[in-house]
Amino acid sequence: MEEVDSKDISSSKAEDCVPSGGECHEEAVDELMKEDEVGGEEETEQTKGIKRKAESILPRKNKQGRLSLEQEDEEDANKESGGGGSEKEDAATEQEKGVESEDARKKKEDEVLASSVNDAEPESKVPPSTPAKTGEETEETRSGEEQEKPKEMQEVKLTKSLVEEVRCDRQQGRSSGMTPEDEPPRSESSPCAPGQVKKTGTNASSKNEPAGAKWKGQPAVDASSDESKLRCCKEEYCIGTWNVRSMNPGKLDVVKQEMDRINIDILGISELKWTGMGELNSDDHYIYYCGQQSLRRNGVALIVNKRVQNAIIGCNLKNDRMISLRFQGKPFNLTVIQVFAPTPYAEEGEVYRFYEDLQHLLEITPKIDVLFIIGDWNAKVGSQEIPGITGRFGLGMQNEAGRRLIDFCHHNRLVIANTLFQQPSRRLYTWTSPDGRFRDQIDYIICRQRWRSSVQSAKTRPGADCGSDHKLLIAKFRLKLKIIPKTTRPFRGTNEADDTSEESKPSSEQKGKEKPQASVPSAVSSVPGGSGVTKEVGATSQEAKSVVKQNEKEEPQANVLSAVPSLPAGSGVF
């Protein structure tokens, strides 16, 4: 390298620094010389650094095959020239520094975005997408920095979109009541390639979840559906039917004990063989019965315990073969009909009248009510399954009465419940012949098809015994019954006899009408078939009115009350 003449370099500077007088002190000249030497040393250091960079660039360019021999000769000439190429190399270094500053700024932006992503999302175990740089790879990556710039811009855009997606997911999680802890764990996988961002949305996480898994914020059952509302408000009750073959006072006590032991809420009785119709209370058991007026034949009854008695809203004493009770329930009311069908050897007209009366009773029953028809049907439906009517767990062979019963169920959309549940044979048959050789299923619990799912089980209880050839048949169903509030009547005083005004006369006559009816069941007057009792009550009231009118003419009104209890016709009613 040629030596640079310091005099040529410093001549211009010395001329600039000469004072206006043309004289120069020796100290000033020494300082100028020192500054020139320091500047020369700095320039030599810069040129050395430029040469080193150029030497490192040359082998890299030779490897890539981008430089020819002529270019290498030119670079050698530039090294020898030194001064002219130094300015170009300075410009190159400044450009590299600018690129490095831009890279540093972009890295800072990426770090800020990554920190925001970490704040928005839980920490994941996925390793960073860019591998660590080693000392050998730095030289190769510098040449590809310009090519990686557009890729880095794509990564920045993707990270920004990822941050927006995470924010949207967080807002959706807050609106649904979820916390970051409730979010499903993210799946671990291999690091992503450069220029690609791993999607961590809900679609990717749902693939790794089990099929039946649900988040805490989502309900397991849709509470708004009608079926769920019905399911939540139901309670279990037990209903049963029993042919007792005549009910004497001793057998009634046995039946009540069995009801308490098995926890039966509603029990239907067939072949009661009581005369008349009405209701009575016996040891917290309420009995509604209906029989013939004179003959102790047939007869049906419904016995309820104290738990459901307050829910009764109606009673229909139809005839000696059927009776019904209606209970107030939630969400729908409950209607229970107890029947005693004619035997297969009965006349055809009697069987026809039975089904005609039962059809009329069904027509006046609200369609929306939960309906149960229980009793002794004297029919065999057989073990063959009929979809929608009978199940696979019947017993015996079908007979003519059984076919008639199946037609009746098909016409009214009814299902025989005790053929739907698999039970041992001793829990299926309901009647045993006197010699014990034959066992048949002739007692049934029937319900509407739409309420088939409310029945939990249906079977007989062989352990219950009241001296009958029939077994007790029970079924458990789910429904909620409501208690009806009692209505209190206004209290009537006893000073009506002292009142001599004309206004007291109608009240005394009305009182005379009410007293003979005190011991007669309230449901008798509204029951078809109870006409004999109503006629007797009407005749008694007419006689009481005539006696009261005669006493009013002869004596003061104070003697009206004394005349009413002495009626000969009223003694038979009390």
From Swiss-Prot:
It is found in: Cytoplasm; Nucleus. It holds the Pfam family Exo_endo_phos. Residues 199-208 have a biased composition (Polar residues). GO terms for cellular component: cytoplasm; nucleus. Keywords: Cytoplasm, Nucleus. Residues 518-528 have a biased composition (Low complexity). Coiled coil: none annotated. Residues 1-222, 488-574 are annotated as: Disordered. Residues 493-572 are annotated as: Hydrophilic. Residues 1-16, 23-37, 45-55, 86-111, 134-172, 502-516 have a biased composition (Basic and acidic residues). GO terms for molecular function: catalytic activity. Its main location: cytoplasm. Gene duplication of the ancestral BCNT gene leads to the h-type BCNT (CFDP1) gene and the p97BCNT (CFDP2) gene. The latter contains a region derived from the endonuclease domain of a retrotransposable element RTE-1. This repetitive sequence associated with the BCNT gene is specific to Ruminantia. This is Craniofacial development protein 2. It comes from Tragulus javanicus (Lesser Malay chevrotain). The lineage of its organism: Eukaryota, Metazoa, Chordata, Craniata, Vertebrata. The gene is CFDP2.
